[in-house]
Structure formats: structure tokens, C-alpha cells
């Protein structure tokens, strides 16, 4: 895109620039980073790498897998099964290549996306045709602060699903059920 600008900042640089979108790396905790105040004022503009991918390639079949435990194992297993059956399948997200680094994606490519709560927390419009939520238990509360926030992050993988999309809930515990 022609109008894309990069800004490199240090502690002494004051941000007074207006952005349409802010793509936040999943590893950045907005409560503890140098740009905390700016990011908190611009929460509605923060999106994820998953959103950027979906914005440019909505036709690509994605299968998102999230949960507190078992994401990597389940993602790798599903990837290997699909690959063995001859599909052009990629392992992305929190495992494999970052989704925006995948090259050679064609219309028939399937993406298995291991989606962490950090990736999903600021996702606005990523859509996954198939979403699998394995389990949700107390974890990452140092980042999400409350169980409600953590569960809300995990559920973002289904927020934009359509009527014919599929959600699979596996081993959902009692504390999670009120949020579903």
C-alpha cells in the first residue's frame, strides 16, 4: 500500500501522529510498554496481524485453534493430517510462520492458525471458517487481568463467524460456560 508509513520511536519521542490503524505485535503488553498511554487512548484503532491477513485474503480457508492448553499439539496434528491427505496446508500463528510471512498462498490453501489470547485480544474482524476452542482455564491473568478478559480474548476467534461456519468446543469448564 502506498500510504503505509513506518515510525520508529525511542523514549524521548512524543507521539502526536494520528494513525488509521495500529498493528500490535502479540508480544506487546499495552499496560507495560513505553507507548502505553498512547495505545490506551487509541484502543479502537489497534488490530492484529490476523485482521490484516483477513482484510487482504478473506477467501482463504482458515481453521483457528485456541485454548489454554493443547493448541500447538492440536494445530500440528491437524496440519499433518491435512497435509498427508494432499492439501496445501500451512501452520501459522503462534506456531510455524507468522501469518503475514506465509508466501505462495493460493485460493485452495488451508491455514491452520494457532491463535493465542494475545493475538486474539485486539482482533477486530478476523474470521475463521472453522474455530476450535480446546479449553479455557486460569492463565495469562498477569496480561489479561481478569478471567473475563481472558475468556473474551479467546472467544474473538468466533466473533465474526457466519451462520454456516463451524465452532467446536472441546472440554469447556464450568467457569467458562457463562461467557459462551
Predicted regions and their residues:
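Single conserved hydrophobic/aromatic residue that forms the stacking wall/gate
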Residues: 170-180
Amino acid at each position: 500500500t502506498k500510504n503505509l508509513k513506518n515510525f520508529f520511536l525511542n523514549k524521548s519521542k512524543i507521539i502526536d501522529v494520528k494513525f488509521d490503524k495500529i498493528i500490535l505485535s502479540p508480544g506487546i503488553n499495552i499496560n507495560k510498554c513505553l507507548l502505553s498511554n498512547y495505545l490506551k487512548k487509541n484502543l479502537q484503532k489497534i488490530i492484529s496481524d490476523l485482521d490484516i491477513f483477513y482484510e487482504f485474503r478473506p477467501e482463504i480457508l482458515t481453521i483457528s485453534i485456541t485454548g489454554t492448553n493443547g493448541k500447538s499439539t492440536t494445530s500440528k496434528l491437524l496440519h499433518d493430517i491435512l497435509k498427508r491427505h494432499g492439501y496445501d496446508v500451512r501452520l501459522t500463528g503462534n506456531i510455524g510462520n507468522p501469518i503475514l510471512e506465509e508466501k505462495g498462498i493460493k485460493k485452495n490453501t488451508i491455514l491452520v492458525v494457532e491463535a493465542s489470547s494475545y493475538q486474539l485480544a485486539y482482533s477486530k474482524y478476523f474470521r475463521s471458517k472453522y474455530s476450535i476452542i480446546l479449553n479455557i482455564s486460569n492463565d495469562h491473568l498477569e496480561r489479561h487481568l481478569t478471567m473475563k478478559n481472558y475468556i473474551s480474548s479467546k472467544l474473538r476467534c468466533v466473533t465474526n463467524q457466519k451462520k454456516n461456519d463451524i465452532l467446536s468446543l472441546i472440554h469447556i469448564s464450568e467457569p467458562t460456560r457463562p461467557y459462551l
